[in-house]
């Protein structure tokens, strides 16, 4: 890693890409454009419990919302996402999420939100917002990853939502090999037979 890529401050390399919500006229929840997830005009889950759910994503500002101990603090893939719309986090975002989730869940049979393309859960109150929304809308689901410590205040809040909603809140703790529901970097931990597996996308075995 180059010297310029280490010890980055707690904000994105692309501050002009952070969208101030008072000036932002677009929705904060975006339909997924990731061809690995869906190539359809309306991106939907193809198999499993959430088959038919429409896929949405939320992108926050990397590092500004992330724990400093994140293994990928310096080499976050957001470093290569110059044009991503990073949504300003805070109370206005949470207000917008409430309104947009209500509209989407009233429109589609099911909605599943990827948290977060960039960024992380930034407060206990923010985690509890998703807990509230999952309780209110039974056709809502969430999946994603967090760099928060399993035992931190935010980590404990995330665990509480997982415990309450199971697969509807499929958030994995990153680089926490002692946690059953975790996602671990291959350069840190080798998969153990019977305990872990490599994502099929990484081995070319996905459909």
Language-model features and meaning:
Residues 1-207:
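Class I S-adenosyl-L-methionine
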């Amino acid at each position: 890693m180059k010297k310029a890529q280490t010890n980055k401050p707690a904000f994105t390399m692309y501050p002009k890409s952070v969208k101030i919500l008072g000036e932002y006229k677009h929705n904060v929840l975006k339909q997924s454009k990731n061809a690995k997830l869906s190539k359809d005009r309306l991106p939907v889950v193809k198999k499993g419990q959430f088959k038919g759910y429409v896929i949405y994503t939320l992108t926050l500002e990397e590092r500004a919302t992330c724990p400093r101990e994140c293994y990928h603090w310096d080499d976050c893939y957001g470093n290569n996402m110059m044009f991503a719309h990073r949504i300003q986090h805070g109370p206005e975002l949470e207000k917008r999420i409430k309104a947009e989730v209500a509209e989407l869940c009233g429109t589609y049979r099911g909605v599943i939100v990827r948290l977060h393309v960039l960024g992380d859960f930034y407060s206990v109150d923010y985690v509890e917002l998703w807990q509230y929304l999952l309780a209110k809308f039974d056709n809502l689901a969430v999946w994603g990853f967090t760099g928060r410590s399993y035992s931190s205040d935010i980590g404990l809040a995330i665990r509480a939502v997982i415990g309450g909603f199971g697969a509807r809140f499929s958030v994995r703790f990153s680089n926490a090999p002692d946690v059953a529901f975790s996602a671990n970097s291959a350069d840190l931990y080798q998969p153990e037979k019977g305990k872990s597996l490599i994502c099929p996308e990484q081995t070319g075995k996905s459909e």
